[in-house]
């Protein structure tokens, strides 16, 4: 059995049988609704057909044309519909009896009679309908008759199911072959090629699936006994059961079953149960070592072919010498020929062994005679094993017909010692004279090449007379054929003869090559030397003769790129040295060639590798490699697969050649591969992983594209030069690049191992060590070198990440701080900081930084404050932990003061147990308190009147004492204008050093001091934050105007540049300038009024109304200078918003297509994206929405799911943009509260109706309409696919009993995608719920069960469950019925989800029922102490033992047995105690209320019989069947105890049976 034959299972699509539904069974309502019969037509198609309604033939042809354009899956569904629709007219004109006869003809598959009979009813139609039937007759005939072939119908139905794992291209290829009428074997061969290119794990998974399909089919044709055997036996034994089932069939069914049996034969044996394999190996191969047994087990586990497994067994067997080897061979031989006992007598078998010692050919003939006596199924099995068995039995015996036994062994041992080639062909040389043989031996012993020996043989042969030559040729021809007969089955022999007769030499050579692998090593050695002679004698053209191609031909074909001098050099090496030296020289010449020659050399040598590789590995294996490459396998994965294939070669010479060739070709391919990658990958790399570079940097890298080392170094240089957000982006992209390239080099499997380490939380060092180990295992030197280069860069990148996100205990590096938090320092200050850092005095370091911060002024101060605050957030959070960091953020968001936050930080630091870490945290906290204190003061000063003392101390140190005194006098008069003028007067009069010192401060300080507390925002700030979109020339112009002091001209120039901007620059400018407007206007009107403006915007108020409100607020400003500035800014901003509005209108409300394609339309293919861009450019937004919806409707499977997620996200984004954050939050709350989609939709409409801007409202309505459709489709998609219900829904409706912490745990597990783990966690939390919360949890989870189970099994099945519940069925019975419904689901994914839900729900329902049952359980220990004290110790022990064995029903019988054995006082004591027990337990079962009623009856004096009857009636009202059964059982015992006679009990039981009925 060959593992590759598993692919034959994809052909099961031709043969799986399912229930056949008659075409005369009209159960589809659409058959009678005209509007539904052609709903597949598009509106455009319907319109076109409408124009042809008066031209019936053209209408029919056009309809069929449209119909044939449908997707295959959709067309298949409609085909079934139209098959019945074609004959639905019969329902109106034929009686039930007549339709019954048509069904009989259909079941008999009598096509001609069926069609004749159908159309015999046509005359009963009116004339119009007759014409319709006639018009469509040809088409309908095809539909009606093609359904009659069950095999064809079923194969079409299941074809997709069995080839789902193929790529679309492969599926199409299979369908094309099927359509073209290709044979079973041809399709099988193609499918096997695809299958073998899959990973081993994927192959194993598919084999398991196909095996289940096989079993399912055979259980349909098996009887009940056989079905049980199929369920319980191992796969190998099932095959024998199957054969009996198939043998009973007849006709077409049998023909089909035989094909199924052939296809499934390997599957039902491909992987026997592990225990069976272990047992077989231990029993039949006991001579093996444990290690060898493990190897064989692994071969079974991997699904390797029986041929491979036998070859490995033979290899192990060949390695055993001495008595152990003899015993092992004897054991194998016994197992091999055990079957003979079934068909031959002991005498015949003994005679066979004698014959074996003298005549091998006669022995083989006799064995085949015995095989002929076997049943057909056993015969096939034995023939498959025969080559292997004969290999064992005959390997130590030579040809007894030609020489003595001992001589043979002598030769064999010589061969083992030094591989004598002459010995290998000696049976072909028995015509030589002794002296000629001696001459050949001399040549061989001299060490000459064996070709010299062959040349001498040819010379001797040439000396023979012609008659002798003819005689020898006939003999040789027979000898050439003998080895084939020895290893081939009879079926294979027939195939070989047919191939030979038809001159199908290509397939014949492949078959012979396969058979050679069954030979012993000595036999292969022989074939190797006589192959060409034999093929010549049999007139077979050796299609593999290429490997004998002369060096000259090879030079022309593959080495034409060499110079004449190089060619002469390699020729000389070829003739004088070994092949490895020859190959090395070729590589050396290639690598030293110029680029153009090297490219040609690579191309030629790759062709040589394909050519010779096919010769060595075989066409089939090369196809596997080709398919792997086509499917995107990495170079390393392909390389590893080639190594595996070579390892499987058993011929040592061929294997050696293969290794040599592989080594050479890997180098050639790696050179070509790397060159291709350089050309293809570099632009790809720039687009994916180096977007953080600017254009000049990218261009510089392009000039180095042929030098990886330089590129890596330059990237690191650029990377080291980045800071802030650019640095973070660079880290993120380069990490992705590292993951991608390392994976491409080491392969999928190793990459998964590395990923696993990361997920397990291993350190960067451990992960790096693992990567190094994996790279070191790469055999190809060039690939390993490339991997090492990439690793160096990646270590560097991940090192930076480690510094950015390192463990809390590590000291953050100065380099990181300089890049992110200390950029405001001057170069001199940085040098000071570095020197302190180098001596490792952290305390002094913090103090010095704070000193520099205190000395900073103006913009430097602002920048320092911002960066140091960021540093505080980063480092303190790093030291106190993520959770505490989040808590501080919440405090800040809730309005806590800095003091309160600082106090909380100190508490957290005190809780740190690590002394070193706590000290670091304390240092950082102390500095940060100062930073936040200074920042707060600085901000306060910034927003209030700056005092003169501060100014004199910090900014006017250049004044003399007299000037300072004058300023103080003016300051006290509160004449700020006079104060400003005086400062400028002093400044203008300054000279020399004083003037220089003043000038340094004038830009950042003096000017600020002059202005009011809402400082005039300087140009540098604007250029950094709001004018980054300007080019250098524009910025220069801005600076010139700014220096002139003309602010009006400055605003105009900004607007001029903005108006002139286009495309992305315009978009960026709009964003930045609007941000500037918000910032400056807020600065002028104050926070409170700015907040009101923000609320207006979010409420959808128009831009015009907002503008008016801003004007009102500005009018309220009392400071005229400030008001003038505010008006100037407002005027400019109105223009900016006007332009932005126009721009937004032109570009679809700022939501441009590029944004949408990147965020919400990634599921579109390139062609669809192109269509979208074309429509977008036309400006037709309505068409754009329609096109998106059209694509969405047409999407299927995973694409549909992804589209639903993205489009819903887009809806949330855009609708929020139209209705504002506040209203969007309300919508979100409604959704989380479980409000229906319809209600949410209404609320959105209400909010849109409140928008006053008509244009904005129109856009919002358009978006809303599209979103309703999207949510509708998504809802359908969920409903159609019984979606995996989302967690938000569950949390809101069914899991509200959980604490926040528990919900967080469940969300975290849910986020991993592991639904089973999610269910398990919910059940774990449910089991641990306190008793007071249990009822709520149980109620919610039961509601969830009803909801989800309904979703899975459907309304109809749910109605059945509901009916069972209402009729009093137990939870167990209901659970079993739900399991039946779930088992009937076809969708495997849906079934798995349903099974998970059902399993959890059984536990949930079990809680209440279990509690109920436990309430009614009799406590045996309590019963013994209260009601069974009359038992002796031995009897009590027996009762307890029954309890421990859980034989509770037997306990009652045993007690009554003991009761019957008592007498006298013991009997009375027992009766009294048991009566008390009866009262107690009956009360327990029927309840307090019913027990009270029974007591009243008893007190009224009714008879025991009447009382018993009443108890029986009461028991029968118990709803729970299990409890009712227990109560009945107790009552039956109590009747005996109370002395009710059997006859009386019978009367009472009549009533009991009435209730049962």
UniProtKB/Swiss-Prot annotation:
Propeptide: 22-60
Keywords of the record: Allergen, Cleavage on pair of basic residues, Glycoprotein, Lipid-binding, Repeat, Retinol-binding, Signal
Keyword Signal: yes
Cited SUPFAM superfamilies: ARM repeat
Glycan-modified residues: 997
Keyword Signal appears in the UniProt entry: yes
Maturation and modification: Nematode polyprotein allergens (NPAs) are synthesized as large polypeptides that are subsequently proteolytically cleaved to active polypeptide units.
InterPro entries, A to Z: ABA-1_nematode, Aerolysin-like_pore-former, ARM-type_fold, DVA-1_sf
Leader sequence segment: 1-21
Function: Has high binding affinity for fatty acids and retinoids.
PANTHER family hit by this protein: AEROLYSIN-LIKE PROTEIN-RELATED
Family: Belongs to the NPA family.
Protein's name according to its UniProt entry: DVA-1 polyprotein
Source organism (scientific name): Dictyocaulus viviparus
Gene that this polypeptide is encoded by: DVA-1
């Amino acid at each position: 059995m060959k593992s590759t034959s598993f692919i034959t299972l994809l052909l099961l699509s031709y043969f799986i049988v399912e229930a056949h539904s008659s075409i005369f069974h009209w159960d589809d309502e659409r058959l009678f609704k005209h509007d539904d019969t052609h709903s597949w037509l598009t509106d455009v198609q319907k319109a076109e057909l409408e124009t042809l309604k008066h031209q019936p033939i053209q209408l029919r042809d056009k309809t069929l044309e449209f119909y044939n354009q449908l997707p295959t899956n959709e067309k298949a569904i409609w085909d079934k519909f139209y098959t019945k629709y074609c004959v639905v007219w019969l329902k109106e004109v034929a009686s039930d009896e007549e339709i019954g006869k048509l069904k009989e003809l259909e079941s008999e598959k009598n096509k001609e009679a069926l069609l004749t009979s159908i159309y015999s009813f046509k005359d009963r139609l009116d004339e119009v309908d007759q014409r319709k039937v006639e018009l469509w007759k040809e088409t309908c005939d095809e539909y009606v008759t093609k359904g009659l072939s069950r095999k064809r119908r079923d194969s079409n139905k299941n074809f997709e199911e069995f080839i789902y794992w193929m790529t679309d291209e492969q599926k199409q290829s299979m369908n094309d072959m099927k359509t073209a009428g290709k044979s079973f074997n041809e399709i099988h061969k193609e499918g096997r090629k695809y299958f073998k290119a899959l990973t081993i794990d994927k192959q194993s998974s598919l084999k398991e699936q196909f095996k289940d399909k096989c079993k399912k089919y055979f259980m349909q044709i098996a009887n009940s006994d056989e079905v049980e055997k199929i369920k319980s036996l191992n796969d190998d034994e099932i095959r024998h059961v199957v054969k009996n089932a198939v043998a009973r069939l007849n006709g077409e069914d049998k023909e089909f079953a035989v094909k199924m049996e052939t296809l499934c034969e390997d599957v039902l044996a491909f992987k026997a149960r592990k225990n069976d394999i272990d047992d077989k190996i231990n029993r039949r191969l006991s001579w093996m070592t444990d290690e060898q047994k493990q190897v064989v087990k692994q071969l079974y586990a991997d699904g390797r072919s029986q041929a491979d497994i036998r070859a490995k067994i033979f290899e192990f067997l060949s390695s055993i010498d001495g008595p152990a080897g003899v015993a092992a061979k004897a054991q194998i031989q016994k197992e091999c020929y055990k079957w003979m006992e079934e068909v031959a007598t002991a005498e015949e078998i003994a005679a066979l062994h004698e014959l074996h010692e003298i005549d091998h050919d006669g022995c083989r003939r006799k064995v085949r005679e015995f095989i002929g006596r076997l049943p057909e199924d056993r015969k096939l099995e034995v023939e498959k094993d025969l080559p292997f068995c004969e290999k064992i039995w005959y390997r130590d015996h030579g040809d007894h017909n030609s020489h003595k036994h001992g001589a043979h062994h002598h030769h064999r041992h010589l061969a083992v010692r030094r591989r004598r080639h002459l010995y290998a062909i000696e049976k072909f040389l028995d015509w030589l004279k002794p002296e000629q043989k001696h001459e050949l031996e001399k040549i061989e012993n001299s060490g000459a090449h064996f070709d010299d020996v062959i040349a001498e043989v040819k010379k001797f042969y040439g000396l023979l007379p012609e008659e002798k030559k003819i005689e020898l040729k006939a003999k040789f021809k027979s000898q050439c054929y003998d080895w084939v007969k020895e290893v081939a089955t009879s079926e294979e022999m027939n195939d070989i003869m047919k191939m030979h007769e038809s001159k199908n030499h290509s397939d014949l050579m492949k078959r012979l090559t396969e058979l050679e692998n069954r030979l012993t090593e000595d036999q292969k050695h022989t074939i190797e030397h006589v192959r060409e002679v034999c093929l010549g004698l049999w007139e077979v053209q050796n299609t593999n003769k290429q490997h004998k191609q002369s060096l000259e031909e090879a030079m022309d074909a593959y080495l034409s790129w060499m110079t004449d001098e190089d060619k002469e050099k390699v020729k000389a090496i070829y003739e004088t040295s070994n092949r490895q030296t020859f190959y090395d020289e070729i590589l050396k010449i290639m690598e030293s060639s110029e680029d153009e020659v090297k490219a040609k050399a690579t191309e030629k040598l790759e062709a040589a590798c394909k050519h010779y590789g096919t010769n060595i590995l075989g066409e089939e294996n090369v196809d596997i490699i080709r398919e792997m490459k086509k499917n995107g396998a990495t170079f390393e994965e392909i390389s590893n697969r080639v190594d595996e294939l070579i390892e499987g070669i058993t011929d040592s010479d061929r294997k050696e050649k293969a290794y040599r060739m592989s080594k050479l070709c890997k180098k050639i391919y790696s050179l070509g591969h790397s060159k291709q990658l350089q050309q293809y990958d570099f632009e790809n790399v720039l687009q994916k992983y180096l977007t953080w570079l600017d254009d000049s940097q990218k261009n510089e890298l392009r000039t180095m594209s042929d030098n990886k080392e330089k590129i890596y170094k330059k990237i690191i240089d650029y990377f080291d030069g980045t800071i802030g957000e650019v640095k973070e982006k660079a880290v993120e992209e380069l990490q992705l690049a590292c993951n991608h390239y390392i994976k491409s080099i080491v392969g999928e499997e190793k990459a998964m191992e590395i990923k696993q380490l990361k997920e397990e939380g291993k350190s960067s060092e451990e992960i790096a060590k693992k990567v190094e180990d994996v790279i070191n295992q790469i055999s190809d030197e060039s690939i390993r070198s490339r991997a090492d280069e990439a690793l160096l860069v990646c270590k560097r990148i991940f090192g930076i990440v480690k510094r950015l996100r390192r463990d809390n205990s590590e000291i953050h590096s100065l380099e990181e701080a300089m890049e992110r938090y200390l950029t405001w320092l001057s170069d001199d200050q940085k040098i000071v900081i570095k020197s302190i850092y180098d001596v490792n005095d952290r305390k002094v370091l913090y103090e010095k930084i704070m000193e520099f911060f205190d000395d900073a002024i103006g913009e430097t101060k602002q920048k320092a404050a911002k960066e140091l605050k960021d540093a505080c957030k980063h480092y303190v959070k790093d030291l106190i932990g993520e959770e505490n960091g989040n808590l501080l953020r919440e405090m800040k968001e809730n309005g806590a003061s800095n003091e309160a936050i600082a106090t909380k930080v100190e508490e957290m630091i005190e809780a740190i147990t690590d002394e070193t870490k706590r000290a670091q945290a304390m240092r950082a906290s102390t500095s940060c308190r100062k930073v936040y204190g200074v920042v707060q003061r600085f901000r306060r000063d910034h927003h209030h009147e700056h005092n003169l003392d501060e100014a004199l101390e910090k900014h006017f140190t250049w004044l003399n004492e007299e000037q300072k005194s004058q300023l103080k006098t003016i300051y006290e008069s509160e004449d700020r204008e006079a104060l400003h003028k005086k400062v400028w007067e002093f400044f203008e009069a300054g000279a020399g050093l004083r003037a220089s010192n003043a000038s340094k401060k004038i830009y950042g300080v003096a000017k600020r001091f002059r202005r009011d507390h809402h400082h005039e925002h300087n140009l540098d700030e604007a250029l950094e934050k709001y004018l980054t979109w300007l080019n250098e020339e524009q910025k220069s112009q801005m600076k010139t105007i700014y220096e002139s002091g003309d602010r009006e001209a400055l605003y105009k120039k900004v607007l001029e540049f903005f108006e002139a901007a286009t495309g992305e620059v315009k978009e960026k400018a709009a964003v930045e300038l609007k941000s500037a407007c918000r910032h400056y206007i807020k600065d002028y009107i104050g926070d409170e009024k700015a907040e009101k403006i923000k609320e207006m915007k979010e409420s959808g108020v128009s831009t015009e109304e907002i503008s008016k409100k801003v004007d009102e607020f500005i009018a309220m400003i009392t400071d005229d200078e400030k008001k003038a500035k505010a008006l100037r800014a407002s005027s400019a901003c109105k223009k900016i918003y006007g332009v932005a509005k126009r721009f937004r209108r032109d570009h679809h409300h700022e939501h441009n297509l590029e944004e949408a394609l990147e965020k919400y339309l990634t599921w579109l293919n390139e062609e669809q994206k192109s269509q979208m861009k074309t429509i977008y450019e036309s400006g037709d937004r309505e068409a754009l929405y329609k096109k998106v919806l059209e694509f969405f409707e047409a999407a299927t499977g995973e694409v549909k799911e992804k589209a639903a997620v993205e489009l819903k996200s887009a809806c949330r984004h855009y609708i929020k943009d139209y209705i504002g954050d506040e209203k969007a939050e309300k919508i979100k709350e409604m959704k989380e509260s479980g409000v229906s989609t319809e209600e949410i939709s209404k609320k959105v409409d209400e909010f849109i109706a409140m928008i006053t801007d008509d244009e904005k409202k129109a856009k919002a309505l358009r978006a809303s309409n599209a979103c309703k459709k999207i949510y509708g489709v998504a809802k359908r998609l969920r409903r159609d696919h019984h979606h995996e219900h989302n967690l938000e829904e569950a949390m809101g409706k069914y899991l509200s009993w959980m604490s926040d912490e528990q919900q967080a745990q469940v969300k975290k597990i849910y986020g991993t995608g592991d639904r089973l783990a999610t269910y398990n966690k919910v059940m774990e939390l449910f089991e641990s719920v306190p008793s007071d919360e249990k009822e709520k949890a149980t109620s919610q989870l039961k509601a969830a069960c009803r909801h989800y189970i309904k979703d899975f099994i459907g309304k109809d099945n749910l109605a059945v469950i509901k009916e069972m519940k209402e009729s009093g069925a137990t939870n167990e019975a209901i659970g079993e019925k739900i399991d039946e419904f779930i088992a009937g689901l076809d969708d495997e994914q849906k079934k798995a989800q349903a099974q998970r839900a059902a399993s959890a729900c059984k536990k949930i329902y079990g809680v209440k029922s279990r509690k109920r049952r436990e309430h009614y359980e009799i406590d045996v220990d309590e019963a013994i102490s209260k009601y069974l004290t009359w038992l002796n110790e031995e009897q009590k022990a027996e009762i307890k033992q029954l309890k421990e064995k859980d034989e509770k029903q037997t306990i009652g019988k045993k007690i009554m047995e003991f009761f019957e054995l008592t007498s006298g006082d013991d009997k009375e004591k027992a009766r009294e105690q048991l009566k008390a027990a009866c009262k107690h337990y009956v009360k327990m079962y029927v309840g307090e209320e019913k027990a009270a009623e029974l007591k009243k009856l008893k007190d009224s004096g009714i008879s025991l019989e009447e009382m018993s009857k009443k108890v029986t009636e009461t028991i029968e009202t118990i709803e729970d069947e299990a409890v009712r059964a227990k109560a009945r059982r107790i009552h039956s015992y109590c009747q005996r105890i109370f002395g009710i006679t059997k006859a009386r009990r019978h009367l009472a039981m009549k009533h009991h049976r009435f209730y049962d009925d």
